[in-house]
Amino acid sequence: MSNKKRIFFTGGGTGGHVFPGISIIQKLKELDNEIEFFWIGKKNSIEEKLIKEQNNIKFIWVPCGKLRRYFSFQNFTDFFKVILGIIKSFYVLKKYKPQIVYATGGFVSTPTIIASSLLKIKRITHEMDLDPGLATKINSKFANKIYTSFKESEKYFKNHKNIIYTGSPIRKEFLTPNPKIIKQLTQNTNKPIVSVLGGSLGANALNNLALFIKKYAEIYFIHQSGKNLNDLREDNYLRRQFFNAEEMASIEKFSNIIISRAGAGAIKEFANACTCVILIPFKKGSRGDQIKNAKLLKNQNACIYIDEDEILNTNILKVIKETLNDREKINSLKENIKKFNNKHSSTLIAKLLIEDIKETKSK
């Protein structure tokens, strides 16, 4: 084992599998500036882009194949990519000798977790969603510890002895949102602000929805579209492909209503912001994780839930206007979503990891 303190993070595919890791690294840097950080992910991916924007995190790519629950001829070629990913991860980990490998989810994390198991490196896998994905289910077979973002997730890991409910880490920018930023973005509007957020990869259904509802001039609309649409500003409408962390924190905190997908990371940010949300979970081609996330909130009256298949049959503008005019409903939704807040999650996890490093180095 190396004398240097090193932690390897691995995960990706969406921002929801990357931002929590960045949050943990931010907190670890505050608590112990001697730790070196590495991130293993896929080449030319969202995780590579996001990690390379950070300071002092070395990104290393490995081959990886998608893990599927259904038959596909790609399963055969992807199987060999997974094997290659395990082999490269093995040699990378053997070279750098980290004390911990931390998986944040996504199929890219599995080769590294398996390789770290072969090398007897301490392994932690963190399930961000309520319902574990296939990657986490596989990772859990090799992990020493499982961290969960929802208390309700523990039932999916009954056979594992070391499960810790940590919550989902939130980036430090979201803990102190700046009200001046939302004023700059909306040009000091006095109108109610409704923000449509498509996530790190964008969302066609939400993009189409935003283009429809922006015609209503009595509301100021903020639209985060992903790379499929160009940036645009109109009288009551601002569209950007991406907002930075400070901008997004201000948008989530000071918008009157947020319309969003139902990824676990986004939900935890909304809970931290204590905001009123309309959730339209991703359905087609997904494993249903966002639907379960959204229904958990719906059942606790913490969000307005709209099924993706019902978008065309739902008068979204009517829902928005009725909600804006119902102060009691807004207050109730805000109070209930606040129960899902884990603003101290990054600190908790960082302290656990520092203890793990001390324990490993003392052996």
Swiss-Prot record:
Pfam families: Glyco_tran_28_C, Glyco_transf_28. Pathway: Cell wall biogenesis; peptidoglycan biosynthesis. It comes from Borrelia garinii subsp. bavariensis (strain ATCC BAA-2496 / DSM 23469 / PBi) (Borreliella bavariensis). The lineage of its organism: Bacteria, Pseudomonadati, Spirochaetota, Spirochaetia, Spirochaetales. UDP-N-acetyl-alpha-D-glucosamine binds at T14, G15, G16, R171, S200, Q290. This is UDP-N-acetylglucosamine--N-acetylmuramyl-(pentapeptide) pyrophosphoryl-undecaprenol N-acetylglucosamine transferase. Keywords: Cell cycle, Cell division, Cell inner membrane, Cell membrane, Cell shape, Cell wall biogenesis/degradation, Glycosyltransferase, Membrane, Peptidoglycan synthesis, Transferase. SUPFAM superfamilies: UDP-Glycosyltransferase/glycogen phosphorylase. Belongs to the glycosyltransferase 28 family. MurG subfamily. GO terms for cellular component: plasma membrane. InterPro entries: GlcNAc_MurG, Glyco_trans_28_C, GlycoTrans_28_N. Its EC number is 2.4.1.227.
